Design a protein with these regions (language model features):
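Conserved mixed alpha/beta catalytic, RNA-binding, or beta-rich assembly cores of soluble enzyme
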Residues: 1-295
Length: 295
């Protein structure tokens, strides 16, 4: 996924085992290049990178040298090219494993030697994939005292989506300020993250809006959407949604500042929680806790 406005990309990888994911993550981070951060969760890795090309500290694993590296992430029309280097077993990973990932359009090897993997060989490859963007949806206030559960409805919404060019990534529960006087029982919003081809963004937004409005039990439901990987401006709202009593007017003002769009037609208090869900929808496990709470 790419976010040209913020100049960043996000690459999500899945493996059959933890070992390769953890080793690759440590070495890519050590090698530098365009890598800016990495999160490992079990057998999955989420790699953050800046768009463009940058020098790497690449070679056999050692102090300040990574045995695998991401040299570039470049966008051309509806395609994204990632340039990789790997040595020995790490070369097998970039030259033989990554090119077989679902969705890869084609792979380009600079030389014939790069096709030979194993031993102490060094391998380089350019992997071309379809361009995807990231959309985060925040949903809140869909239940009542007697029926409904926002997280259940949100997850069903995501899993029921069959739009071509749309991939459901994950769902996160966001703990909002439990001290507010008007709230659902646990005061929790739901965030849904998708990878979307640009031409399918409008269809996904309409699908989410329609599904939520058809399945909600509340007239206060809020639906928020952010198109991008990172927020380009900071806001006190990140803290406020977990610590303060926000008004609807404050929530709408902060959303406009941050480039967050409300999709619901209610314009009710559910927008406050929907905003909070989007703000924390990609901030890790701390999203599920009270402000400042860590495991």
């Amino acid at each position: 996924m790419v976010d040209e406005r913020a100049g960043v990309a996000e690459i999500i990888e899945h493996c059959l085992a933890r070992g390769p994911i953890e080793w690759d993550a440590m070495n890519r981070h050590r090698a530098g290049g365009v890598v800016t951060g990495c999160l490992v969760e079990g057998t999955s890795m989420t790699l953050k990178a800046k768009l463009g090309r940058a020098p790497v500290n690449f070679g056999a694993a050692a102090d300040n040298i990574g045995g695998q590296a991401l040299e570039a992430v470049e966008v051309s029309g509806n395609e994204v090219t990632t340039s990789w280097s790997g040595i020995a077993g790490a070369g097998v990973g970039v030259a033989a494993c990554l090119p077989q990932a679902p969705g890869v359009l084609r792979s380009e090897y600079p030389t014939e030697d790069d096709l030979r993997t194993g031993g102490a060989r060094t391998n380089r490859v350019r992997i071309i994939s379809p361009r995807y963007e990231k959309l985060c949806f925040g949903i809140d206030d869909t239940d009542t005292r007697t029926e409904g559960a926002t997280w259940v409805m949100a997850l069903r919404c995501a899993e029921s989506c069959r739009i071509e060019g749309v991939e459901f990534l994950n769902m996160r529960l966001v703990q909002l300020n439990p001290k507010v006087p008007q709230k659902t029982t646990n005061c929790v919003g739901s965030a849904l993250n998708f990878a979307v081809k640009p031409q399918n963004v409008a269809d996904l937004k309409e699908y989410i809006r329609k599904y939520v409005e058809e399945h909600t039990f509340s007239s206060d439901t809020g639906i928020a959407c952010y198109r991008g990987i990172d927020f380009t401006v900071d806001s006190t709202a990140f803290k406020w949604v977990k610590t303060e009593i926000m008004t609807l007017e404050q929530a709408e003002r902060e959303a406009q500042t941050l480039g967050i769009e409300f999709l619901d037609r209610n314009a009710k208090k559910g927008r406050i929680g929907a905003l909070g869900a989007v703000l924390w929808g990609n901030r890790g496990i701390e999203a599920a806790g009270l402000y400042g709470e860590h495991l």
